[in-house]
Regions:
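Conserved N-terminal beta1-alpha1 strand-loop-helix module at the mouth
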Residues: 1-70, 126-129
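Conserved anion-binding
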Residues: 68-141
Length: 141
């Protein structure tokens, strides 16, 4: 499997995120992440704009979903996300709903292990439930 380089756009302003995204793409990045701060500030329009600007790239929506899995994943998919993120701390039913939404809408589901007390066990469970990508994320705070 070929390694993929991802840039996380953890900004509050879309204009700043686009500058960094363009520079990252020029530098060879493969995946562009609409970070949680950007989505909270700009809404899913951030994903729509990234999809429009970079139609050939993988667009990740770092939703950090904890509940309402199907609804949040559907929203990300309709905005143009290639990958949407659910937290490992979410319930099994929420994670399974995210996976089902991913299958229905044709995108991948990434589970973020950030701060989970038993990340190895949860990663194994997630694979059994059909999660596509396991993310190992260290918090910045």
């Amino acid at each position: 499997m070929e390694a993929k380089l991802q840039v996380a756009l953890d900004f509050l302003e879309m204009s700043r995120a686009l500058v960094v995204a363009r520079e990252a793409v020029d530098g060879g990045v493969h995946w562009i992440e609409a970070g949680t701060p950007l989505i909270k500030s700009e809404g899913l329009d951030a994903v729509r704009i990234l999809r429009e600007e970079f139609p050939e790239h993988t667009i990740v929506a770092d939703m950090k979903t904890m509940d309402a899995g199907r609804t949040e994943m559907e929203s990300a998919a309709k905005a143009g996300a290639s990958v949407a993120v659910v937290l490992a701390a979410a319930s099994e039913s929420t994670i399974r709903e995210c996976v089902e939404a991913g299958r229905n809408y044709g995108f991948k589901v990434q589970m973020d292990l950030v701060s989970h007390p038993d990340p190895v066990r949860r990663a194994v469970e997630a694979c059994e439930w059909g999660v596509d990508i396991i993310g190992v994320h260290c918090p910045i705070d």
